[in-house]
């Protein structure tokens, strides 16, 4: 989260689920919906979670104690990628890509996107 704050990143893209076939694949680095979780000196509030066909969009409010700033960060998580394989169709992934690009452009930020 320190990197997100330092670079003022507004969009995160995640292509994996935290668990697949009972095995941990990724550390969950965010709070549950409508909850705040502290990561060091950064607070992450999961303000909104919307499920689309094949992916989730989360809106986080990030507060940096050190920087004294609060910022909105959007996370897109593709949830239909099968373990050790490829999706049967690309339509949901392409749809998510369009949402990501639109969101990135709407932020008006020149900060990098985190993938």
Swiss-Prot record:
Q: What is this protein called?
A: Tyrosine-protein phosphatase 19
Task: Describe the location of the Tyrosine-protein phosphatase domain by residue ranges.
Answer: 1-115
Q: Give the UniProt family note.
A: Belongs to the protein-tyrosine phosphatase family.
Q: What is its EC number?
A: 3.1.3.48
Show the GO MF annotations: protein tyrosine phosphatase activity
- Which sites bind substrate? 83
Q: What is the lineage of its organism?
A: Eukaryota, Metazoa, Chordata, Tunicata, Ascidiacea
**Broadest EC class assigned to this enzyme:** hydrolase
SUPFAM superfamilies from the UniProt entry: (Phosphotyrosine protein) phosphatases II (SSF52799)
Species assigned in the record? Styela plicata (Wrinkled sea squirt)
Pfam families membership: Y_phosphatase
Cite the InterPro entries for this sequence.
Prot-tyrosine_phosphatase-like, Protein-Tyr_Phosphatase, PTP_cat
Record gene name: STY-19
Could you tell me what reaction this enzyme catalyses?
Answer: O-phospho-L-tyrosyl-[protein] + H2O = L-tyrosyl-[protein] + phosphate
Alphabetized, the UniProt keywords read: Hydrolase, Protein phosphatase
């Amino acid at each position: 989260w320190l990197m997100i704050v330092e670079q003022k990143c507004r969009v995160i893209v995640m292509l994996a689920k935290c668990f697949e076939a009972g095995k941990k694949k990724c550390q969950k680095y965010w709070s549950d919906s409508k909850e705040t979780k502290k990561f060091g000196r950064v607070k992450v509030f999961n303000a909104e979670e919307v499920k689309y066909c094949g992916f989730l969009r989360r809106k986080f409010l990030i507060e940096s104690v050190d920087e004294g700033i609060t910022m909105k960060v959007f996370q897109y998580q593709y949830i239909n990628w099968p373990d050790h394989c490829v999706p049967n169709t690309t339509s949901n992934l392409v749809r998510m890509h369009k949402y990501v690009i639109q969101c990135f452009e709407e932020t008006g930020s020149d900060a990098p996107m985190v993938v």
